[in-house]
């Protein structure tokens, strides 16, 4: 609604974003437009070469109203627009550096929404009443339990008739939806003032829910490791890599691993791990921890570990997330229950 009035229409995009470029202001707020408002964009991420692109556009006569990198995307789409949204989007993707999840509207195609993903999470929810895009699953659970996870450099076109997926080469893709069977309370505050307080009070239950299904006949059985007893005993070092509160969990885990298993453990902030050129000897296990499975620095750390040829284990909540797909093995926390792809 706007000032208490219901807005007409069945297509729309919006985004609340940290002010990474420019001060918080109406001019810098999303969505952003080209000059005649025929192209509209919302953006989660950072365009690293936006100043170079902005300089080029200004030399072509484009004027900017905001200080954001997102407005550059709107004008880039305008510059390359030839009447074909998909071709225009891929041209712009080839010229942008950085991470982005985009929602795009074209006035010429009023019943379509285009969404793009590169190194920033993006999911598509689908139901009989409509289709939605969001950065994470909890945002759509109120409306649907069936979601698609976009891979890197994939594009989706949402229409009244359904969903169409493409890669950056404009080739149409077949994708499977995943049915999310979560306890809705896990995605709500549950009466707490904020999520941090809720998570603190839920820790005992979360630990119990995670461990109970993996204790059988007095033994701890973690089948998700995908390792034989001999391979587990051969591990000589463990790295735990994470960001935010997941990092603090890693620090606590270090004490437990070293006390019980007598294996040396290093805990790294993912943003540091990927740049410090870590020494990863043979028989090392790198444990990647991320609630969403999409944390950019953590995902980059996973890819670095795989490049160096060491075994990786992802610990995440979200099935189908990038870390879940790319790690050698994945362990889902039992606090949330997720079904397999349908």
What are these regions (language model features)?
Residues 1-193, 205-236:
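Conserved short alpha-helical segments that host acidic/polar catalytic motifs at enzyme active sites
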Residues 58, 306, 324:
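Anion (oxyanion) recognition and catalysis
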Residues 64, 265-267, 330:
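Generic structural signal for residues in well-ordered beta-strands
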Residues 121-122, 132-134, 204-221, 229-286, ...:
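Anionic-ligand anchoring segments at beta-strand to alpha-helix junctions in alpha/beta enzyme folds, i.e.
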Residues 299-306:
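Surface-exposed amphipathic alpha-helices with a cationic face
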Residues 323-332:
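Acidic-glycine-rich active-site phosphate/pyrophosphate-binding loop
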Residues 334-342:
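Residue-level detector of conserved catalytic or cofactor/ligand-binding positions
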